[in-house]
Amino acid sequence: MQIITLTSDIGLRDFYVASVKGRLLQAVNGAQLIDITHQIKPFDVAEAAYQLRSCYASFPRGTIHMVGVDTEPYLPYKITDPSQENQLTYPSILTYDGHFFISNDNGFIGTFLGEGVPEALYRYVRIEEEPESWTFMMKTCFVDLASNIVNKVPFKDFTVEVNAYKKAFTPNPIIEHNMIQGNVIHIDHFGNIITNIFKHDFERFGLNVPFTISYQKRNYDIDVISKAYNDVTISERVAIFNDTERLEIAINRGANGGNGGADRLFGMRLGEPVRVTFFPKGSVRNLDSLL
């Protein structure tokens, strides 16, 4: 039974998701379809990359991941000047870590990979001859590509192997002497604030080094990493390393629509800065370490 995951920006209000699933079930006999999310902000390939990067490894190798975000290709007939060639986008298949990823090469692939190296990358160039597919690529072209993978059609029979791909802009944390400057990259359903600061960024400064996590809401700094949300009392602020080892700031039992998530209470939005300042031995904050 072939597992196929679906990530898109087409929402749940309309028939679009059902239409994609219906065609997949016709094209791939016995397919097991798993929704990751269809609530990606329209055309936001960076968010799609974050969501899929956070969970793809939970699926067995051989899983096919379809990414229906900003899918319409930008093809050569639209080019009026050679300088525009870097704008070209094609439906592509990425193989990475034993998984298959079908998406438009619109920045998703490079952002998903980060520092990772693809096993292979294939471009579906025949799309230039299939204008009837352009307006709903996830239902048409992407389903056909998934079917070819399942049926073990050789990639050389329907794609061209390439080694270049685009990357959307995503901020990386800035690591300086005694400080990490990061950003909010995602706010989840509970209003929890997820940053681009990883656990390994913390560990570069050594173990048991005092620190302060600061953000927009003054006087609400955090100076401890908890193991679980319930390590603090209900409605208290908490910092943890989440399932993906990213620094997360939350309100215990807080939720948007309830008591209020951390994003509301702290006035945090996507892109807002989050700073971690360390106080190593001998610093003004940590003079006791010299005694």
Residue positions per predicted region:
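Anionic-ligand-binding alpha/beta catalytic cores of soluble enzymes and soluble regulatory domains
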Residues: 128-207
